[in-house]
Regions:
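Conserved, structured core segments of small domains
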Residues: 1-94
Length: 94
C-alpha cells in the first residue's frame, strides 16, 4: 500500500536540514520510496518534504517516517502519514 509522508520543517531550520541531508538521502535508499522531494519557500529554500513510500500498513509507514534522520534530528514541526492512491502516470499501471 502507498503512503504519502507530508512533513513541515520547524521555522529557521535550514541549517539542520542541510547538515542532516546526506543521512536522510542514504536512509531513503533503504526503504521502498516511489518518489520524494522537498517543499520550497518563496525564496526557493526547502521547508518540508513529501515522500511517497510503500508499506504493509499505516503502522509500518509511520515507523518508516519516524526513522528518517530528518525526523530523528527534530527537523519537523509536523509529520502526517496518509494512505495514497497513485492514479495519474503510475508507471506500474502501463
Amino acid at each position: 500500500m502507498l503512503f504519502a509522508v507530508i512533513c513541515t520543517d520547524k521555522p529557521n531550520s535550514l541549517d539542520l536540514r542541510m547538515a542532516t541531508r546526506p543521512a536522510h538521502l542514504t536512509y531513503l535508499e533503504t526503504v521502498d520510496v516511489k518518489g520524494a522531494g522537498p517543499f520550497l519557500d518563496a525564496s526557493g529554500n526547502p521547508n518540508g518534504s513529501l515522500v511517497i513510500i510503500e508499506a504493509a500498513d499505516q503502522a509500518e509507514a509511520q515507523a518508516i517516517a519516524g526513522r528518517d534522520p530528518y525526523a530523528m534530528a527534530g527537523l519537523f514541526a509536523s509529520i502526517e502519514v496518509r494512505p495514497w492512491k497513485w492514479l495519474i502516470k503510475n508507471p506500474e499501471t502501463k
